[in-house]
Amino acid sequence: IAEKYPQGCFDMIFADPPYFLSNGGITCQSGRVASVNKGGWDKSQGIEKNHAFNTEWLKLCQQVLKPNGTIWVTGTMHVIYSIGFAMQQLGFKMLNDIIWEKPNPPPNLACRYFTHSTEIVLWAAQSIKSKHCFNYEAMKNQNDGKQMKSVWRIKPPGANEKFFGKHPTQKPIELLKRCIEASTNEGD
């Protein structure tokens, strides 16, 4: 897709890459046992190959970002550390790690670890030299006049948000709206 666009054309990118979790496991969705297999695209090829994949798609994103553009990337503990490391290797300027807290996560069926109730959203600028956009006052206004913190409590998307089918890891509109409002200006 990146080849269709000229270099430096986007002010912001929101990426939801594979989490590499399709491993034959199960979860609970709407009170029913469900497979976690999303498809071959989400199956791990091993740590090194997964990291190479993350580095490659991030390179493409970096090329199409404007010099002052930013990227938001979501992930769980299974993939986000590789992504953050790849971003640092590529020279992105790390701005924040947002913790998206889900108030109603699926239950922990294995009972061998804490319930996964968060995802991490990394926010980074195109390079160390970037003078990125941050709409500080707008974020403060959304938080009753207080500075917006890096823990965001947002419900996962409901059925009313799933207009175009059922993407297995669809993000809530409120999450994307906040990212867009924080890091872009009207008309971008």
Task: Identify the meaning behind each predicted range.
Residues 1-188:
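Core catalytic lobe of class I
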